[in-house]
Amino acid sequence: MPRKFLGNKIEKNVDAVRPSSLTLTADDLKYIPPIPQDFEDEDDKVLRTSNGGNRLSKRFGGTLKLKKRLESVPELFLHDFKKRPRSQLEVIREKKFTDMQVPKGPVCPQSTILPLRERKKVKSLPIQRKSLRRPTLSKPAVVQSLGHKTHSDHIIDKVFVSRPAPIVMPVKALTPINPVSLMQTQTQDCCRKNKYGKSGSEILFDEILSAYENVSTSDSTALNSEIDRIIDICASKQIAKKNEAFQVPYVVCPDDTETLFSSTTPKLKPVNSNTLNDVISSPEYTTSGCSTYSDQSNSDEELSEVESIVWNTNKRTMRSSIVSESTSEEGYCTAAETLPSTVSVEDLDIHNKLPKVAQTSSCNTLLNKLSIRKLKKVILDPPKIMHVMTFDDDSDDGDDNDDEDRALNILQKKIDCIEIASCSSSIYSE
């Protein structure tokens, strides 16, 4: 089947072929070929290889060897692992354990152990070794006598104790350390360990670190006590400043010359905070009229003599008016409302001199409302209506033409008589 990619069409008889069992018809089934008689012999030939091994047909999934390999992968791995080349050290260790195998006897009670040991003879077992570098001479076998064996029996029995002795770890006692000697030993050890030695800066750095690590406790306590003393002094100064914040000297009698001309500092007494608050003016602002005119009253010295006289005469009336206005519901007043002007419009005698406005028409009132600067005179030409002549007009009678001319003249007169009352800033005229 050819290879297909994304977007390629699949052909019916090329890419997808139906199996033969589905393509059989009734006529094909009528003519089935006969089964051969020597089928078994052919089957044996097919299932056997030239080497004598059995194999399956390719139709049934491949050879028997492939099937065995897939089913026994761990066994094949171990088989290959054993065939792998190994070093000579591994061979020596393996032979040592195989040669030194001793058969284990049955478990006997302790009473029968001693006669069995006497019967057995001590035999020397030669040890076979393979050296990698050069061969060495074989050591002579050591033969132990029976007398030596009997003497060692009671020693062996003493080894097997029912309860072993408790293990106690050694405890190191703390000893006072001299920092100078410790630094010297550390520098000597470092020089011995490092064949080439450390640089001068590294040795100095190690000495500084060791000196800071082994600081005596007496120095630290002295430093802490000094810090505490300075903190106490600072705290006491702050308390003294708070107590001496508001103090007033005692009033001394002027006749007492001793206290006036003495070199000592005068005696002080603390001041109550309530009295200070009463003396100091508050920074809050008020909306009453008195506060607004307090600044003006302070500026009387800057005014001239005439203005000061006028101001003093009107001060009472102004204060009374301010108090009355401050008690009103609004609670706010301006300078323009409170200050009385010297000349008022009502006092002027000009009402009779003002011209009286006469009643005029709507057109005149419109002209009066408009400003004179914006008025412009515009001349409009009357529209001229011309009668359009056509070919059909020649055939009409003269009476019809006269009637049309009369109607146009009447309409023209009406248009000329119309007065346009415009709201714009221009006057229309013929």
UniProtKB/Swiss-Prot annotation:
Localization, UniProt: Bud neck
Induction: Expressed periodically during cell division. Requires ACE2, CBK1, MOB2 and SWI5.
Main location: other
GO cellular component: cellular bud neck; cytoplasm; nucleus
Domain of life where this protein originates: Eukaryota
Alphabetical UniProt keywords: Cell cycle, Phosphoprotein
Phosphoserine modifications at: S395
Role noted for this protein: May be involved in the establishment of the daughter fate.
Additional note from the record: Present with 922 molecules/cell in log phase SD medium.
Protein name as it appears in the record: Protein DSE3
